Amino acid sequence: MTNIRKTHPLLKIENNAFIDLPAPSNISSWWNFGSLLGICLILQILTGLFLAMHYTADTTTAFSSVTHICRDVNYGWIIRYMHANGASMFFICLFMHVGRGLYYGSYTYMETWNIGVILLFATMATAFMGYVLPWGQMSFWGATVITNLLSAIPYIGTNLVEWIWGGFSVDKATLTRFFAFHFIFPFIIAALAMVHLLFLHETGSNNPTGISSDTDKIPFHPYYTIKDILGALLLVLALMTLVLFSPDLLGDPDNYTPANPLNTPPHIKPEWYFLFAYAILRSIPNKLGGVLALVLSILILVLMPLLHTSKQRSMMFRPISQCLFWILVADLLTLTWIGGQPVEHPYIIIGQLASIMYFLLILVLMPMASTIENNLLKW
């Protein structure tokens, strides 16, 4: 008798995706982040659902409803902090996942890569809207500043901003719609993740060498299921350490002050995972220019397959490109640091140099290094 998992219409989809899937025998721990992102998403949806049961999306009660969750709801504090810090873990995994794709040339799977970029944008939008919901000072002013950036769009900018706000300022209508969108987006992300996997399974996984692994495949289960479980345990360990020992480490103290439209915080800044993009935005004196640079800093990922000039797919055997890749990582860490600093000397110039370096590395230096390495192969 044929095994039910191979014949049942639903089970065979699961089987072909997670059990009998032929996987390269040499994929490293850098390939764990896809499954970790799936776990993060499920965790965020579950904790978010329980938070939504007690949250009220109204300007007068939003802040106190979050306080009520932390003080009066059974284990509300742990659900709230798991959700807030779960977002941080989500972005850590996202950055690692994208970094892995850049290093090992996974972007040559164009469809998978482009869906991934859309997923990144969707996740960033969701996280931004979620940050507004507690209706603290940084929630309110973050929403005001970031939505206001759209006013830089010529001709329709101001109308667009007021349309998003649902009025002439960030108010009750804004909060309500942000809550609605924040609730629905994770399900859209889950659907996109399935499409992401669908495209990936059309080609099969890449591997550290960047060479076809068709000659040496192993079944996903049990080899990579057990490996993913280990990754998941480490993820949960890191998350729970953060939640139980220093839940506010990555948050902003200003968000424990209820939103006040009449009082601007001294330093308006987003959550840590947006700081690199925020630094790029701030380093350009022109408003529209800053907004364009902000969008392009992420959208540049779409160009990666076009900028690939190397004869080799992976960076595994390309020392010059490796060096530039790690300089890019250091540059992004510098931008993250700058994004959290006040706009004053010397931070302004450091931010501008780091922003120039970011685009220069991706658009000019890395393709040049690849060409040099191609020529070195001839010697």
From Swiss-Prot:
PROSITE patterns assigned: CYTB_CTER, CYTB_NTER
Gene3D superfamilies: Cytochrome Bc1 Complex, Chain C (1.20.810.10)
Keywords: Electron transport, Heme, Iron, Membrane, Metal-binding, Mitochondrion, Mitochondrion inner membrane, Respiratory chain, Transmembrane, Transmembrane helix, Transport, Ubiquinone
Cofactor note as given: Binds 2 heme b groups non-covalently.
GO CC terms in record: mitochondrial inner membrane; respiratory chain complex III
Bilayer topology term: Multi-pass membrane protein
GO BP annotation list: mitochondrial electron transport, ubiquinol to cytochrome c
Membrane-spanning intervals of the chain: 33-53, 77-98, 113-133, 178-198, 226-246, 288-308, 320-340, 347-367
Amino acids binding heme b b562: H83, H182
Cell compartments where the protein resides: Mitochondrion inner membrane
A GO term for molecular function: ubiquinol-cytochrome-c reductase activity
Annotated positions binding heme b b566: H97, H196
Main subcellular location of this protein, as a coarse class: mitochondrion
Binding site for a ubiquinone: H201
Cofactor (UniProt): heme b
Job of this protein: Component of the ubiquinol-cytochrome c reductase complex (complex III or cytochrome b-c1 complex) that is part of the mitochondrial respiratory chain. The b-c1 complex mediates electron transfer from ubiquinol to cytochrome c. Contributes to the generation of a proton gradient across the mitochondrial membrane that is then used for ATP synthesis.
Family statement drawn from the similarity comment of this UniProt entry: Belongs to the cytochrome b family.
Leftover remarks: Heme 1 (or BL or b562) is low-potential and absorbs at about 562 nm, and heme 2 (or BH or b566) is high-potential and absorbs at about 566 nm.
Oligomeric and partner information: The cytochrome bc1 complex contains 11 subunits: 3 respiratory subunits (MT-CYB, CYC1 and UQCRFS1), 2 core proteins (UQCRC1 and UQCRC2) and 6 low-molecular weight proteins (UQCRH/QCR6, UQCRB/QCR7, UQCRQ/QCR8, UQCR10/QCR9, UQCR11/QCR10 and a cleavage product of UQCRFS1). This cytochrome bc1 complex then forms a dimer.
Name this polypeptide is given: Cytochrome b
